[in-house]
């Protein structure tokens, strides 16, 4: 199915010209998709959803959606055997696990018996912790789609190879992944790993005389 959208810098919100929208929605309405913004948001999630619903603040829906996805309750669940090695590798980097306090409406990093508020943790660690959370709670399962804007932003370059491995393993497990990046190193790691762990397509977007 092809979805055609025409817009420019003067197009107002929701006023873009769209073709084949109805058939697109019909075919993909049941598809589970997740968008991870370049800016980490869980550290600022306290009462954000309720405030947004009451129009006290205005946030892009993608931020609200990722908070909803991260809040999925996993307390009663157990790690699937296939996920365990991946989760363990991520836990070694973040040195703990993600914990959501439903009563306080806050995310924490849990280190053994102690916990630290999410906003006190380095942003790069928080981004990796979010990936751990989405894998743990079943958001990223076979048949789902992940969109991630600049996954390398604020992450220690030493951890980039592991992030690439994680994403390629998710792809092998049936998760379709779209990444936007300006980082050559991240792209090169995908290029190197592609022959080993799956197929990756690269698309370069650039300006022309026509826009």
Predicted feature locations:
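Switch/communication elements of ASCE P-loop NTPase nucleotide-binding domains
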Residues: 108-211
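Phosphate-coordinating catalytic segments in nucleotide- and nucleic-acid-processing enzymes
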Residues: 1-143, 211
């Amino acid at each position: 199915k092809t979805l055609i959208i025409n817009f420019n810098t003067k197009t107002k919100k929701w006023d873009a010209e769209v073709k084949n929208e109805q058939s697109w929605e019909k075919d993909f309405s049941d598809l589970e998709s997740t968008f991870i913004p370049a800016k980490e948001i869980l550290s600022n999630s306290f009462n954000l959803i309720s405030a947004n619903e009451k129009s006290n603040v205005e946030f892009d829906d993608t931020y609200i959606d990722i908070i909803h996805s991260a809040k999925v309750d996993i307390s009663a669940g157990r790690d699937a055997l296939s996920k365990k090695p991946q989760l363990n590798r991520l836990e070694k980097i973040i040195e703990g696990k993600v914990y959501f306090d439903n009563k306080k409406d806050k995310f924490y990093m849990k280190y053994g018996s102690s916990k630290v508020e999410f906003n006190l943790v380095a942003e790069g660690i928080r981004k990796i912790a979010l990936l751990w959370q989405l894998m743990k709670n079943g958001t990223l399962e076979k048949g789902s789609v992940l969109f991630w804007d600049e996954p390398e932003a604020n992450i220690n370059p030493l951890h980039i190879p592991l992030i690439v491995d994680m994403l390629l393993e998710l792809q092998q497990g049936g998760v379709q992944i779209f990444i936007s990046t300006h980082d050559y190193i991240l792209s090169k790691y995908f290029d190197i790993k592609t022959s080993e762990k799956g197929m990756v397509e690269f698309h370069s977007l650039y300006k022309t005389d026509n826009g």
